[in-house]
């Protein structure tokens, strides 16, 4: 099942999404080389089947992709503005078009929600809170919005010499799929990707907000430091991990 979440208040949902007592730690895997998208998709699908068969533990997989676009189940053809700029893949997750590429930290989340909470809305809220807490470690204020999924950064945007307005830009996208209550796909966080590569699509179908990154916000950050912060924040919300990298 894929899940579309729009116009829904998630602020009241609890942040904790820990597993039942006795659940093994979540495996934490980091791949440093670029991973082709079809390879990652095959891996996730196989892992989900093994989790369902109780032959594998839950896992978070951190990686980067080469430049590409993915289309979610709600993607509209008109939102692919430059079809031949990068490879385009059908993702099977919820959401619309998004960009993946070097400088973007991908976290694929393969969790058994039956061991946690069978509530996809609460799961998405917990993923957002995970990213918000990670960003706070770098003094970035990430925010969620009722009418759109993901994590957003608000900042001043001078549109003219007379007016100073706020702009809202997305720093992290979320797109998941759930099969028999086991999740896959996950989140993408813009660390220092080439933001011009988003020009080939309408990201997530949203035209009136932009995208940003750590570098764009004036905070050049090493991917290793992002990973440490992600790990610390994950344990606060989802529980213990074991590093298998």
UniProtKB/Swiss-Prot annotation:
Annotated binding of substrate, by residue: 93-100, 173-175, 186-188
Record Pfam families: LplA-B_cat (PF21948)
A single GO BP: protein modification process
Catalytic residues (positions): 204
Pathway: Protein modification; protein lipoylation via endogenous pathway; protein N(6)-(lipoyl)lysine from octanoyl-[acyl-carrier-protein]: step 1/2
UniProt domain BPL/LPL catalytic: residue ranges: 54-242
Stored CDD domains: LipB
Site, Lowers pKa of active site Cys: residue positions: 170
Gene3D superfamilies: Bira Bifunctional Protein, Domain 2
SUPFAM superfamilies found in the cross-reference section: Class II aaRS and biotin synthetases
Gene Ontology molecular functions: lipoyl(octanoyl) transferase activity
Subcellular location: Cytoplasm
Enzyme Commission number(s): 2.3.1.181
Record bears the keyword Cytoplasm: yes
Keywords on record: Acyltransferase, Cytoplasm, Transferase
Functional summary from the UniProt entry: Catalyzes the transfer of endogenously produced octanoic acid from octanoyl-acyl-carrier-protein onto the lipoyl domains of lipoate-dependent enzymes. Lipoyl-ACP can also act as a substrate although octanoyl-ACP is likely to be the physiological substrate.
Name of the molecule in the record: Octanoyltransferase
């Amino acid at each position: 099942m894929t899940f579309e979440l729009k116009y829904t208040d998630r602020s009241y949902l609890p942040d904790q999404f820990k597993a039942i007592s006795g659940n093994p730690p979540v495996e934490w895997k980091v791949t440093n080389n670029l991973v082709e998208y079809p390879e990652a998709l095959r891996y996730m699908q196989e892992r989900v089947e093994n989790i369902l068969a109780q032959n594998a533990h839950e896992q978070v997989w951190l990686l980067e992709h080469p430049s590409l676009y993915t289309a979610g189940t709600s993607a509209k053809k008109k939102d692919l503005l430059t079809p031949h700029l990068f490879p385009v893949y059908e993702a099977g997750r919820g959401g619309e078009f998004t960009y993946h590429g070097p400088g973007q930290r991908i976290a694929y989340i393969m969790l058994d929600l039956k061991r946690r909470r069978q509530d996809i809305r609460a799961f998405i809220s917990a993923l957002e809170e995970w990213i918000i807490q990670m960003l706070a470690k770098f003094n970035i204020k990430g925010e969620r919005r009722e009418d759109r999924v993901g994590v957003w950064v608000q900042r001043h945007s001078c549109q003219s010499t007379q007016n100073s307005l706020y702009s809202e830009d997305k720093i992290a996208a979320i797109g998941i799929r759930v099969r028999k209550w086991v999740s896959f796909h996950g989140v993408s966080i813009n660390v220092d990707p080439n933001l011009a590569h988003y020009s080939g699509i309408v990201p997530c179908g949203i035209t009136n907000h932009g995208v940003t990154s750590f570098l764009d916000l004036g905070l050049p950050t090493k991917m290793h430091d992002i990973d440490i912060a992600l790990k610390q924040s994950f344990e606060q919300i989802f529980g213990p991990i074991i590093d298998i990298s």
